[in-house]
């Protein structure tokens, strides 16, 4: 099955819009004793001039709301002088017209999601299950403040590039059987979880070529790069034993190895045990208490 969604949104604020394309694919099949399920999703989004929020100087709603009731909003249209500089006296709030027509921000996002699962039904009691998943996010954000903007008098441009990737792999063996009055279920498996995030931020100040919004138009530029990587390797198992649908015993054990902890002290194990007694099985069928259990 394949679906496509096309979303277009033109904001009530001039110079603002959003477009989003979503592609979805889902397929499954059986090949003998093997069942396969796969899904994929791709989302592409482009946004022009996201609104500022909170107490930002560029929050248009806040700036209009805090105007005196005697202030004519028509006066705001005179937002620049003859030299195209900021024409305002308030250093704490940006004229909405200036923010709309002189400042800008743009973003693009590409997101990929993949999920796959295969189940091998070896026999009626035993099966193997493998699962893979991945999520890749690529986000680019450009924020521009024209020269003479309050707080950015020399001009400002920042380009941020985010590359976030996550992978998950799991393999499970599942067994269930019944012997007389006993029910038995067991699970044994392992998992690998990986994160790889990279961020690059380029900041430019002191704009010299006002007509060209680009890094080359600025005198000063700086580069900041950050990365975050993590991997967790896990093994785990669970056992459940039941007797006559009356008594149940459960035990689990899991061990994780984290790449972010010191070598030699990066493994942690946590077991669990529980038991339950379904006393309602000893009672005659009653509408008053159809099911009761101590755990």
Give the positions of each predicted feature.
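Outer-membrane beta-barrel architecture
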Residues: 1, 26, 115-117, 121, ...
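Transmembrane beta-strand segments that form the barrel wall of outer-membrane beta-barrel proteins
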Residues: 4-10, 249-258
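Extended, hydrophobic alpha-helical segments in both membrane/secreted and soluble proteins
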Residues: 23-25, 130, 169, 233-239, ...
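Outer-membrane beta-barrel strand-turn architecture
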Residues: 30-33, 120-124, 177-180, 242-245, ...
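Surface-exposed loop/interface segments of Gram-negative outer-membrane beta-barrel transport/assembly proteins
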Residues: 11-16, 22-111, 129-233, 260-262, ...
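Short, charged, low-hydrophobicity "junction" segments
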Residues: 66, 245-247
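Aromatic- and histidine-enriched alpha-helix N-cap/loop-to-helix transition segments
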Residues: 110, 267-268
């Amino acid at each position: 099955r394949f679906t496509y969604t096309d979303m277009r949104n033109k904001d009530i604020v001039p110079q603002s819009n959003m477009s989003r394309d979503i592609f979805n694919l889902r397929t499954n099949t059986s090949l003998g004793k093997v069942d396969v399920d796969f899904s994929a999703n791709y989302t592409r989004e482009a946004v022009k001039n996201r609104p500022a929020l909170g107490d930002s100087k560029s929050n248009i709603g806040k700036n209009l709301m805090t105007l005196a009731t005697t202030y004519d909003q028509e006066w705001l249209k005179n937002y620049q002088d003859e030299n195209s500089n900021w024409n305002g006296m308030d250093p704490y709030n940006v004229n909405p017209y200036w923010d709309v027509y002189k400042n800008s921000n743009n973003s693009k996002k590409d997101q990929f999601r993949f999920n796959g699962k295969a189940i091998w039904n070896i026999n009626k009691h035993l099966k193997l299950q493998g699962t893979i998943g991945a999520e890749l996010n690529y986000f680019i954000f450009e924020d521009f403040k024209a020269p003479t903007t309050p707080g950015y008098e020399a001009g400002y441009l920042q380009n941020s590039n985010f590359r976030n990737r996550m992978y998950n792999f799991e393999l499970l063996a599942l067994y269930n059987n019944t012997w007389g009055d006993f029910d038995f279920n067991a699970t044994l498996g392992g998992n690998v979880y990986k994160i790889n995030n990279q961020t690059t931020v380029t900041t430019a100040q002191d704009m010299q070529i006002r007509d060209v919004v680009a890094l080359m138009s600025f005198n000063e530029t700086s580069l900041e790069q950050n990365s975050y990587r993590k991997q967790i390797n896990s093994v785990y198992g669970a056992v459940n034993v039941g007797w006559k649908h009356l008594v149940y015993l459960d035990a689990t054990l899991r061990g994780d190895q984290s790449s972010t902890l010191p070598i030699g002290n990066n493994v942690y194990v946590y077991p669990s045990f529980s038991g339950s007694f379904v006393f309602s099985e000893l009672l005659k069928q009653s509408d008053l208490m159809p099911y009761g259990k101590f755990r």
